[in-house]
């Protein structure tokens, strides 16, 4: 399964493509999409068209994107949300299933703790994917999102398969969590 991870940003959007075979993760590609110093619609157009180009080049089977966090500055949060929306539009236009993860979930999946620093994420992404060099922060975050999905997708499919049995015991799966 080929997974495209996206770390959205209005100025710089990171992308990372990995392939999962069983428990093995293989690096395919990563990079950044830099938007021009232009008005908002032009920046969103660049994100939409560039993510579409990445999809056309690498043909992922599914995609994962980082959720927006609420920033101290509400305007920044809104702008980030619009950049994220442009990326999601490109993904769904290509008929990809899109999973969403918080930064906390990504850091836990990659580093093992939710309060990890960016440098720790970069280091672990390099180690997990056996990269020769340290990836840039935006590309590392995007690869981290893809790694998170590679691990989470397996767990969710196992829970989904167990859903009928869990229901008989008065339990159910909600948002990827087991609840009573």
Swiss-Prot record:
Matching Gene3D superfamilies: Ribonuclease H-like superfamily/Ribonuclease H
Family matches, as CDD domains: RuvC
Binding of Mg(2+) 2, residues: 66
Catalytic residues (positions): 7, 66, 138
Keywords: Cytoplasm, DNA damage, DNA recombination, DNA repair, DNA-binding, Endonuclease, Hydrolase, Magnesium, Metal-binding, Nuclease
InterPro entries to which the protein is assigned, alphabetical: RNaseH-like_sf (IPR012337), RNaseH_sf (IPR036397), X-over_junc_endoDNase_Mg_BS (IPR020563), X-over_junc_endoDNase_RuvC (IPR002176)
Subcellular localization, as worded in the UniProt entry: Cytoplasm
Catalysed transformations (reactions): Endonucleolytic cleavage at a junction such as a reciprocal single-stranded crossover between two homologous DNA duplexes (Holliday junction)
Cofactor requirement: Mg(2+)
Binding site for Mg(2+) 1: 7, 138
EC number: 3.1.21.10
Superkingdom per UniProt: Bacteria
Cross-referenced Pfam families: RuvC (PF02075)
EC top class, as a word: hydrolase
A GO biological-process term: DNA recombination
GO molecular function terms attached to this record: crossover junction DNA endonuclease activity; DNA binding; magnesium ion binding
SUBUNIT field: Homodimer which binds Holliday junction (HJ) DNA. The HJ becomes 2-fold symmetrical on binding to RuvC with unstacked arms; it has a different conformation from HJ DNA in complex with RuvA. In the full resolvosome a probable DNA-RuvA(4)-RuvB(12)-RuvC(2) complex forms which resolves the HJ.
UniProt similarity note: Belongs to the RuvC family.
Protein name: Crossover junction endodeoxyribonuclease RuvC
Gene: ruvC
């Amino acid at each position: 399964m080929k997974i495209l991870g996206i770390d959205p940003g209005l100025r710089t959007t990171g992308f990372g493509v990995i392939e999962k075979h069983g428990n093995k993760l293989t690096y395919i590609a990563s990079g950044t999409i830099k938007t021009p110093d232009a008005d908002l619609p032009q920046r969103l157009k660049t994100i939409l068209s560039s993510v579409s180009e990445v999809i056309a080049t690498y043909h992922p089977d599914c995609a994962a994107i980082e959720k927006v966090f609420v920033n101290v500055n509400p305007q920044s949060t809104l702008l980030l949300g619009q950049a994220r929306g442009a990326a999601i539009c490109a993904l769904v236009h290509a008929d990809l299933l899109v999973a969403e993860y918080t930064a906390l979930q990504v850091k836990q999946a990659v580093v093992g703790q939710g309060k990890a620093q960016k440098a720790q994420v970069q280091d672990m992404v390099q180690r997990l994917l056996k990269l020769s060099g340290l990836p840039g922060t935006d590309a590392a975050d995007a690869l981290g999102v893809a790694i998170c999905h590679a691990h989470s997708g397996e767990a969710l499919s196992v829970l989904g398969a167990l859903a009928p049995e869990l229901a008989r015991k008065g339990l159910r799966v909600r948002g990827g969590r087991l609840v009573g």
